[in-house]
């Protein structure tokens, strides 16, 4: 009896000094309800006006106490005011259980985590108490079945909370009167069976088993604050249901309305372009971190352009990672292009893992995959499995990321190239394999070759007469070229020789110099335009590398010098041979095709070696790193001293490359190109506008005044097909709906186990009343009730978490739409827009207030929770049950609390 006496003593202390309140037992002393009101007034005098209460008003007193405790403290009404009036001796176990919740609340925390105050609707408060009194309606009706007929009070989320806490309160059948009352008040409104104290749940005047209180539509157990009443008496439904989630509790869906988009992780990781498109359509404004490798973001429709097919593309294919070398979409990809992203530190790479078949574009025949171990006739270092940097003129590059429209620089480049060449000069594979150029990639036979060759000869002769500028000093004309051409590892030693690394220069048809300027090629410009800044720079550099003969080294310059008397073709072959000997085998073998630039540019090119050796003021020489894994990973790094280009011996070849007229300089570096820090950054107007608008939006003051507030999904100018996720989901404490559901299901299982134990323990308690074993059983009962409270507390915290996350996402959506409306001048706003703006403001304020309420409630709970462990320990010590400590380890009991705290 020590446990009961200890609780009784606590009640006596709390009620001391209150008139008409005398705690001499745990039954009749509480019948008039004044004791309950006194305890509440002692701790919360603001909730009850005790001086206005009268001892004879039994029903009103009990009703007031039960209502206040439920609405403001979150303590479920386990007792019924009508039962207290009807029974001369109230059920002792019910009162003990109910009062123990008062004790726990004022010494620790609310059984249900203090959710009631936040979730309960104030207008329903008066009817809720009566609802809690299932016995009231039941008492009026002859049988449990009719008990359903009385009209239900307005839907209230709070009752759920009550049921979850501790349904314990039906008067036990101790006496005839008690039995009569308990029979009526302890019957489940769904199954019609007896409801034990530990199973009791009162909602809107009906008593239910906790396990019977399920959603009518999805049959999921209803959770605190996540259900509503229906037009049919005694039936409730979830506020929202999880989409096709059988095991998930419906309440979670309501908390995560944006779930279809929330699962953006799935949509953005999907490997199928079609799936990515579907996901994008489903949530156009969803916030998801743009995955660098997401094909969805690359779904910028590529405008088919005949010129694009002839554009020079850079294919870097590493034998170890062939799947990454696909820059061109497979024919089946439709408009979804693999996006080129700066996925690796080495540079830009094709980030479309889904485009498995994109290894080569249809326009590029077998020549594209060209793993040729054999070295060209030059006999340079064997290019065995060196990563192939194939600069292939094909639509692959353009197809990789086709911009919505040609940029000015790209269009001019295309025109210039078309002027000199009808088709690409060299097939991607010819450089290494030595096999003849493929029909699709080779220049239209002699016509284009001879035309370019003749033009170059004339230009070179004119340059020789004019003379070349000092070796270390790039002329203004050439200075422009280096900027467009990133400093390759080998300062484009004879551009003629190195670009064409094919076994025979004849196969190439034109020396790399003779080919149209690769940097200006439509493919490179189109790619760069569609890429992010980093990606565009790397792409532009890769194009420049192609022109320069990326794999060539300073040594090729010597061949160029002595080749002054020889034809360009011979000079090229000589330089090629030497370049192979000195330069990396893989680079030379693969980079030959890039050199397709206009003759004018090639004439400017001779000076590039010097320009590379001495970059423009403030610029450090750069080289193309030879190591890359898969898809074009081209990075510019400072040239090592030993790799700085040696000034080529003065010879006709160098003089021939003396500064060209300004017009040629314009050809090499179009005015439309933004040359910054040696990076070519052509951007399509559409993308520039989007990026600029995005930056402007970020600079705008946020409605909340939070400088770091992320843009809402509705306000972010997402690219076509781009999927983004809400910033809320990026928070380290964010719990996905699936994780919350998993934890709730785990709590559900543990609650079921506790209820089974509680049913057996209740039977033993009623059978052992007055025996010596009663005190020990009562301690066990208190512990069981407390464990249940802990589980319900975890459940309420999860619900808090879920609701808070939903409100935060909702706030972002409202904020984005509101910001757009407020950005519009008042004079231009329509009446409908003004109304919508006002409505959004009200919603915004309401959402913020709801979030604040949740935070305040949780803070209050934390303060109470800090004392709970010690208070419970003191209670056990007062009972003199030290032997129980080994059985009831506090570490075990409080482990759920420690687990639930991180979820906050």
Swiss-Prot record:
The modification Phosphothreonine is found at residue 644. The modification Phosphoserine is found at residues 110, 143, 153, 249, 294, 494, 504, 598, 649, 658, 660, 726. Residues 261-697 are annotated as: Mediates targeting to the cell plasma membrane. Residues 735-771 form a coiled coil. It is found in: Cell membrane; Cell junction, Tight junction; Recycling endosome; Cell projection. Residues 1-260 are annotated as: Forms an intramolecular interaction with the C-terminal coiled coil domain keeping the protein in a closed conformation. One of its GO terms (cellular component) is plasma membrane. Residues 807-903 are annotated as: Mediates interaction with RAB13 and is required for transition from the closed to the opened conformation. The keyword Phosphoprotein applies. Residues 723-874 form the bMERB domain. Residues 593-622 have a biased composition (Basic and acidic residues). The keyword RNA-binding does not apply. Keywords: Cell junction, Cell membrane, Cell projection, Coiled coil, Cytoplasm, Cytoskeleton, Endosome, LIM domain, Membrane, Metal-binding, Phosphoprotein, Tight junction, Zinc. Residues 117-178, 251-722 are annotated as: Disordered. It is a peripheral membrane protein. Signal peptide: none annotated. Residues 698-807 are annotated as: Forms an intramolecular interaction with the N-terminal Calponin-homology and LIM zinc-binding domains-containing region keeping the protein in a closed conformation. GO terms for molecular function: actin filament binding; actinin binding; filamin binding; metal ion binding; small GTPase binding. CDD domains: CH_MICALL2, LIM_Mical_like_1. One of its GO terms (biological process) is endosome membrane tubulation. SUPFAM superfamilies: Calponin-homology domain, CH-domain (SSF47576), Glucocorticoid receptor-like (DNA-binding domain) (SSF57716). Exists in a closed and an open conformation due to interaction of the C-terminal coiled-coil domain with an N-terminal region including the calponin-homology (CH) and the LIM zinc-binding domain. The conformational change is regulated by RAB13 and RAB8A. Adopts its closed form upon interaction with RAB8A and interaction with RAB13 causes conformational change from closed to open. Effector of small Rab GTPases which is involved in junctional complexes assembly through the regulation of cell adhesion molecules transport to the plasma membrane and actin cytoskeleton reorganization. Regulates the endocytic recycling of occludins, claudins and E-cadherin to the plasma membrane and may thereby regulate the establishment of tight junctions and adherens junctions. In parallel, may regulate actin cytoskeleton reorganization directly through interaction with F-actin or indirectly through actinins and filamins. This is MICAL-like protein 2. It comes from Homo sapiens (Human).
């Amino acid at each position: 009896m020590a446990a009961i006496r200890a609780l009784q003593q606590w009640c006596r202390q709390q009620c001391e000094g209150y008139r008409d309140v005398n705690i001499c037992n745990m039954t009749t002393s509480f019948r008039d309800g004044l004791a309950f009101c006194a305890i509440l007034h002692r701790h919360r005098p603001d909730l009850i006006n005790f001086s206005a209460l009268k001892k004879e008003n039994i029903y009103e007193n009990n009703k007031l106490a039960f209502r206040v405790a439920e609405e403001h403290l979150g303590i479920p009404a386990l007792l019924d005011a009508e039962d207290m009036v009807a029974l001369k001796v109230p059920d002792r176990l019910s009162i003990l259980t109910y009062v123990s919740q008062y004790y726990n609340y004022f010494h620790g925390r609310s059984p249900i985590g203090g959710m009631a105050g936040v979730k309960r609707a104030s207008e329903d408060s008066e009817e809720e108490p009566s609802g809690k009194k299932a016995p009231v309606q039941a008492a009026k009706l002859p049988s449990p079945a009719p008990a359903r007929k009385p009209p239900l009070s307005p839907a209230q989320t709070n009752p759920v909370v009550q049921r979850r806490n501790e349904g314990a309160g039906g008067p036990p059948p101790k006496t005839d009167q008690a039995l009569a009352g308990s029979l009526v008040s302890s019957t489940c409104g769904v199954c019609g069976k007896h409801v034990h104290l530990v199973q009791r749940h009162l909602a809107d005047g009906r008593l239910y088993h906790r396990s019977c209180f399920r959603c009518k539509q999805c049959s999921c157990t209803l959770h605190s604050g996540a259900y509503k009443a229906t037009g049919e008496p005694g039936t409730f439904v979830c506020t929202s249901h999880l989409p096709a989630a059988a095991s998930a509790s419906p309440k979670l869906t309501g908390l995560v309305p944006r779930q279809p988009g929330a699962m953006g992780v799935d949509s953005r990781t999907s490997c199928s372009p079609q799936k990515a498109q579907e996901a994008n359509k489903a949530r156009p404004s969803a916030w998801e971190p743009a995955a660098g490798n997401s094909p969805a973001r690359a779904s910028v429709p590529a405008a088919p352009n005949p010129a694009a097919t002839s554009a020079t593309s850079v294919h870097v294919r590493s034998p170890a990672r062939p799947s990454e070398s696909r820059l061109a979409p497979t024919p089946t990809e439709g408009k979804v292009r693999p996006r080129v992203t700066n996925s690796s530190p080495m540079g830009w790479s094709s980030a479309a893992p889904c485009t498995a078949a994109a290894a080569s574009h249809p326009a590029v025949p077998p020549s594209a995959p060209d793993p040729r171990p054999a070295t060209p006739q030059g006999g340079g270092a064997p290019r065995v499995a060196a990563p192939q940097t194939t600069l292939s003129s094909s639509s692959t590059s353009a197809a990789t990321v086709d911009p919505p429209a040609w940029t000015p620089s790209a269009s001019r480049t295309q025109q210039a190239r078309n002027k000199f060449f009808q088709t690409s000069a060299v097939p991607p594979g010819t450089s290494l394999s030595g096999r003849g150029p493929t029909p699709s990639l080779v220049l239209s036979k002699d016509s284009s070759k001879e035309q370019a060759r003749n033009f170059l000869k004339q230009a070179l002769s004119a340059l020789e007469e004019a003379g070349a500028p000092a070796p270390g000093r790039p002329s203004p004309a050439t200075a422009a070229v280096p900027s467009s051409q990133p400093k390759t590892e080998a300062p484009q030693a004879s551009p003629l020789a190195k670009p064409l690394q094919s076994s025979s220069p004849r196969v190439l048809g034109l020396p790399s110099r003779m080919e149209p300027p690769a940097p200006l090629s439509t493919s490179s410009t189109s790619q760069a335009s569609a890429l992010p800044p980093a990606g565009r720079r790397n792409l532009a550099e890769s194009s420049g590398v192609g022109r320069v003969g990326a794999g060539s080294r300073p040594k090729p310059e010597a061949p160029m010098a002595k080749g002054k008397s020889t034809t360009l073709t011979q000079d090229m072959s000589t330089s090629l041979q030497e370049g192979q000997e000195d330069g990396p085998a893989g680079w030379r073998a693969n980079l030959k095709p890039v050199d397709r630039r206009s003759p004018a540019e090639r004439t400017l090119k001779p000076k590039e070696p010097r320009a590379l050796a001495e970059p423009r003021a403030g610029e450090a020489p750069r080289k193309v790193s030879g190591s890359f894994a898969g898809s074009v990973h081209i990075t510019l790094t400072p040239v090592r001293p030993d790799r700085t280009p040696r000034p080529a011996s003065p010879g006709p070849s160098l003089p021939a490359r003396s500064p060209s007229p300004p017009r040629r300089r314009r050809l090499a570096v179009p005015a439309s190109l933004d040359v910054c820090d040696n990076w070519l950054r052509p951007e399509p107007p559409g993308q520039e506008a989007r990026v600029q608008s995005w930056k402007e939006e970020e600079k705008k003051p946020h409605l909340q005044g939070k400088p770091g507030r992320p843009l809402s999904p509705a306000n972010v100018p997402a690219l076509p097909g781009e999927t983004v996720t809400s910033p809320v989901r990026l928070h380290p404490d964010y719990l996905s709906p699936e994780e919350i559901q998993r934890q709730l299901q785990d709590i559900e299982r543990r609650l079921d186990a506790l209820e089974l134990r509680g049913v057996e323990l209740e039977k033993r308690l009623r059978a052992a009343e007055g025996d010596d074993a009663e005190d020990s059983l009562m301690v066990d009962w208190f512990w069981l009730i407390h464990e249940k409270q802990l589980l319900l507390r975890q459940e309420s915290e999860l619900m808090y978490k879920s609701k808070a996350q939903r409100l935060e996402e909702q706030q972002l959506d409202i904020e984005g739409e509101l910001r757009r409306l407020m950005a519009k001048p008042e004079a231009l706003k329509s009446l409908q827009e003004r109304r919508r703006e006002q409505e959004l403001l009200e919603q915004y304020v309401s959402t913020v207030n709801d979030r604040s309420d949740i935070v305040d409630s949780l803070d209050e709970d934390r303060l109470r929770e800090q004392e709970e462990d010690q208070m419970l320990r003191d209670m056990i010590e007062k009972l003199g049950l030290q032997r129980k400590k080994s059985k009831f380890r506090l570490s075990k009991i409080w482990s759920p609390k420690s687990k639930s705290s991180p979820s906050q």
